[in-house]
Swiss-Prot record:
Protein name in UniProt: Cell division control protein 73
Keywords: Activator, Nucleus, Phosphoprotein, Transcription, Transcription regulation
The keyword Phosphoprotein appears for this protein: yes
Residue(s) carrying Phosphoserine: S114, S150
GO MF annotation, one: RNA polymerase II C-terminal domain phosphoserine binding
Location of region: Disordered: 210-235
InterPro entries: Cdc73/Parafibromin (IPR007852), CDC73_C (IPR031336), CDC73_C_sf (IPR038103)
Database matches in Pfam families: CDC73_C (PF05179)
Family classification: Belongs to the CDC73 family.
GO-annotated biological processes: mRNA 3'-end processing; negative regulation of DNA recombination; positive regulation of transcription elongation by RNA polymerase I; positive regulation of transcription elongation by RNA polymerase II; regulation of transcription-coupled nucleotide-excision repair; transcription elongation by RNA polymerase I; transcription elongation by RNA polymerase II
Known function: The PAF1 complex is a multifunctional complex. Involved in transcription initiation via genetic interactions with TATA-binding proteins. Involved in elongation. It regulates 3'-end formation of snR47 by modulating the recruitment or stable association of NRD1 and NAB3 with RNA polymerase II. Also has a role in transcription-coupled histone modification. Required for activation of RAD6 ubiquitin conjugate and the BRE1 ubiquitin ligase which ubiquitinate 'Lys-126' histone H2B.
Domain of life: Eukaryota
UniProt lineage: Eukaryota, Fungi, Dikarya, Ascomycota, Saccharomycotina
Species of origin: Saccharomyces cerevisiae (strain ATCC 204508 / S288c)
Gene3D superfamilies registered for this protein in UniProt: RNA polymerase II accessory factor, Cdc73 C-terminal domain
Amino acid sequence: MANSLDRLREHLKNGDKLVLKNNEGQSTDDITKATMVETLSSDGSTQDSFPLNEETEIEIDGSLVQLRIIVHCWMNKDSSAADYLADCQNKQLTNVSFLQRTDLINWLSGNTESSQYLKAPGQKGETSDKVDIENKTLAGELSTVKSTTSASLENDSEVSDPVVVETMKHERILVDHNSALRGAKPINFGYLIKDAELKLVQSIKGSLRGSKLPPGHKGAHGRISKTNGSSGGPRKDPIILIPSAASSILTVANIKQFLLESKYVNPRNLPSVPNGLVNIEKNFERISRPIRFIIVDNTRMFTKPEYWDRVVAIFTTGHTWQFNNYQWNSPQELFQRCKGYYFHFAGDSVPQHVQQWNVEKVELDKNKRFKDVEVVRYFWHSLEKELISRGYR
């Protein structure tokens, strides 16, 4: 018996091929129908043959196994644990666990000179009483190959070796599998669902609105149509973005006085505003309720994409670095999506690149402050049309 196993091992070490034979001496791929296994050399000649029902000196789960199990294990040496386990289930053969299978394959191929499962005295393999504990209910619990394979690998770690047991007593579990995958910082991604829903609704509404427009019509100001939610529900305050540059004509320091009191004051003569944010409220003739605007000179608080949907106007100085942290860095794309304004003093030339942008040029007089009323009235009238195009009523 041991000689048959040793002879088979020598053939496998030499690279000989295994061929299964049935009772009639014909080749077969089904090991359950085979009765013999033959070894073929590289030139195709038969070297040796072995009965598959012969009991070997390999002990698995406390009992000696037939050569059929060893051959089946070898023929599936390149199969995954899941595929091998499924094949054992289909053919009703003893399942050799992953660690046991690895040990046997290494011994049969000659990679190792011993196997802890070889029980015959005097053989090159170790005489060992170590028995790996396998899950006896794997066959009935094969709801999925994946879960059963996981259970098999888990049980392989339960050994009765006193050295291993003693070593495991001194182990400290720093992190388990689930904790490593979960991470240490809990993050709630629920807001992404709301953002996705908002984007989806806006996309659908935009498509419906665009389909009702006459051919060739692009909407107000020839820009890409954007909505800000359902016209029947409550709306969040619209946002006006202004430059943060100290050289800008309008800053958070003087914007409120300019838009509400129609009076321009040089921002250098006014104290700075903390946080770069001011709020103003404005009544419009064609909108039924007062609109409260948030005016900011930066996008640090734009933590969600929906904030950009609320931007109804952008003031620019003509410097492209102003748009570095914007959702759209290109002025051409930015002002196709958002209403743009370029405020400048009368007599100052408008840069050539600004003239190519889709922005409204608004002129201020340097000295005649009584003209500020007309300028502010023009701005609010322009912005009112923008709000109405976005669904404000």
